[in-house]
Amino acid sequence: MKSYKTKIFSVLCAAMALGATSCVGDLDLMPNDPNTITAGNLTPEQYEAVLAKCYSGMAVSGQYGPDGASDISGLDGGTSQYTRGIFMLNEFSTDESKWIWADEGVFDLVTNTWSKGNANIFGTYSRMYVHIAICNDFLRLVGNDEKFAEMALEARALRAMSYYNIVDMFGKGGFVTEADAPGTAPVQKSRVELYNWLETELLDIVAKMSDAQPKYGRVGKDGAEALLARLYLNAEVFTGTPAYDKCAQCCENIISRHVGTGFQGSGLVENYLWLFCGDNDVYMPGGGDTNEILWGIAYDATNTQPYGGTTFLCAAAYKSVDEGGVYMNCEDYGLNQQWGCMHATPEFSDKFAAAPEDVRWSMWVKEDKGFKKENTKFSEFTDGYAVVKFTNLLRDNKATGSMKVGEITKFPNTDLPLIRLADVYLMYAECALRGAANTAKGLQYINYVRERAGVPAYTAIDLTLDNILDERCRELYWENVRRTDLVRFGKFAKGYNWSWKAGVPEGADFPEYMNLFPIPSNVIASQPDFEQNIGY
């Protein structure tokens, strides 16, 4: 797979050489050094290089280095990286992760006290729209040229992911496509309008994409249809009308393309933790092994060095310390970079209490290494278990699932899963319990996930909504779905408390309008006809 990575990143370098940064004036944001490539005499390879910018817009912050030449202004390059921004909103605001440093705006996310002026909310909103603009530029460039139809489908899928994130986190948002001329003022669309467009767009993309595996690191039919399934799963929240039957059908379509390989023939990778290690590229689309990762972001220790992505998920969870009965060493996980600033809440840790043998938390650093479960001191890294899920280790023994230290690097080679087949199985199980799919099949599907984790299978009596929510937490933690799940189950703003929720040590409810984030005040100021979300 390393040869595939080399090719991916050589294409990305070509994109940078072409100056493919995007003209984003049609979104009235703040790009740095914007350029638009025009059609004409570009070769197919150069078109592919421009498409690479649509991909890199989700992987890195900008053109150069981990914190240099970011595509957006106002935040440092590390904080403003695409998936790190989503993590700050969808994970920091929940029970799964607490950031202990007093970074501007982050404490408000961790304690559910944010406002419309929060810089990180603005940065994440802006990052989504800069990415949308980059994809729009590419689609304008290729037009209706049939030679580049597959590339256009990929760009549309990438853009759909960003619009999905807007619908999920902000509800309403500005809307611009390649059909609008550059410089066109965005029109604000409601959550329902954006949902309807997304559904139509994704249905068309899925229908036209090939069933074949895409090239390594690219998005194909599985990824696009999984995003559609995720849209349908949350339809009742997004529109007021459930679409669990449509979600279940998408799940069945995806599963049918994967059965017969992997764990118990389910298409799942045999060893859970191998999905998040330094040579997990084999499980990516086009990776050559069991492709459980339906959509992911390719990373390489030499060529992609963001302070977001998997670097963030590794380094923030590690701290090298050996004193007073406390031990942890970042090099044990194949990395020589450690921040020690992100840990679990006790409520999150308790999700594993019923089956402590669960492999999904087997690498966490707990009491035996001097870490406490309780978040007694908010700013103390060891007051809370260290959550080790993402590593730069290498696969070793398939029978035991063991891993080994390879080359120790500052940045990981670990690719970042965006949507996995395990999520699809859990989506189907939830749809079944909500009356829109086969219950026996839903039970079988959730048990694939549980048995792979080394915990006892559920019986029919165990198949409850609460158990599905908890299983999603155990399986998908730190994969940017927790806030969305809690909102869908009615347990985000109220109905379930965790340490420091609403800024209270024991946790407290907060207003339900905060199920959505505010439209940033900077956006409202620059687009006075845009409406703010209720409550802000």
Please place each PLM-identified region on the residue numbering.
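Conserved, well-structured interaction surfaces
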Residues: P44-A52, S56-G62, E96-F170, P186-E193, ...
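Glycine-rich, aromatic-lined ligand/substrate-binding cores of catalytic
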Residues: V60, Y64, N291-E380, N438
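Short, surface-exposed recognition loops and adjoining beta-strand edges that mediate ligand/DNA contacts
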Residues: T36-T38, Y64-E91, V176-A179, S210-A226, ...
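Membrane-proximal, proline-rich intrinsically disordered regions
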Residues: C23-Q81, C251, S526-Y536
